[in-house]
Design a protein with these regions (language model features):
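Residue-level recognition of beta-strand->loop/alpha-helix junctions
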Residues: 75-77, 153, 192-194
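Conserved SGNH/GDSL esterase-like catalytic core that processes O-acyl groups on lipids
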Residues: 33-39, 45-134
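Bacterial N-terminal signal peptides
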Residues: 11-22
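Hydrophobic positions in alpha-helices of CheY-like receiver
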Residues: 136-140
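Bacterial N-terminal signal peptides that target proteins for export
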Residues: 2-13
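A short helix->loop->beta-strand "cap" motif at the edges of active sites that frequently abuts
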Residues: 144-148
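Substrate-gating cap/lid alpha-helix
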Residues: 157-194
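Bacterial Sec-dependent signal peptides at the C-terminal "C-region" and cleavage site
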Residues: 20-32
Length: 194
């Protein structure tokens, strides 16, 4: 075999090995598992209002620490947000809702309803609550058809809170019942935060 032919053959083999290695590495990178996205949708409780250093201690941050690197947890909490579309601060009109849709969560934890106990909201729009809740779920499902829903019961209203004193404890109970009904209707999981 001549020297030139040997070098040509060796070059072809090296080129083949290089191409094979490059393709294998590219395929391996494509097989890298993407993290499971968890969208935490809610109000000030989700946001972390009142928590010292909320960027490190809000429940979505704590959830991220518990779940680890295989998950990506997004905090889409909006202080004062109502679930009701006709409420005083509808979640669906907030930037956080648009961000939650763009996030395309694989899991959506929804913790809304506490601000709907406001006298401006529940007495006037209670009949829209189930429909509005299911509509939010439908929007999140449109962003990711395989989304898994986890609905959170509302946290208690403190007995010193003005809404408790004003008699909205009954409304709180009615909303709690509605959330349980929504979980049953939709097949979503139901959890407590307390």
């Amino acid at each position: 075999m001549s020297k030139n032919r040997f070098h040509t053959t060796l070059s072809a083999i090296l080129l083949g090995v290089f191409c094979f290695t490059s393709l294998t590495l590219t395929a391996a990178r494509k097989k890298t598992v993407k993290p499971i996205k968890v969208a935490c949708v809610g109000n000030s409780i989700t946001y972390g209002t009142g928590i010292k250093d909320r960027e490190h201690f809000s429940y979505p941050v704590q959830l991220q620490k518990m779940l680890g690197d295989k998950y990506e947890v997004g905090n889409f909490g909006k202080p004062g947000a109502t679930l009701l579309y006709h409420g005083h601060r509808p979640y669906v009109q907030q930037k956080e809702f648009k961000d939650a849709l763009a996030f395309k969560g694989d899991i959506a934890v929804i913790h809304l309803g506490i601000n709907d106990t406001d006298p401006r909201n529940w007495p006037n729009y209670r009949d829209e609550f189930v429909k509005d809740y299911l509509s939010i779920m439908d929007s999140l499902r449109a962003a990711n058809p395989k989304v898994r829903f986890i609905l959170a019961r509302m946290t208690p209203i403190a007995d010193r809170h003005p809404r408790f004193i004003s008699g909205t404890k009954l409304w709180h109970d009615e909303i709690q019942d509605a959330i349980e009904t929504i979980a049953r209707i939709s097949g979503a999981e139901l959890i407590d935060f307390h």
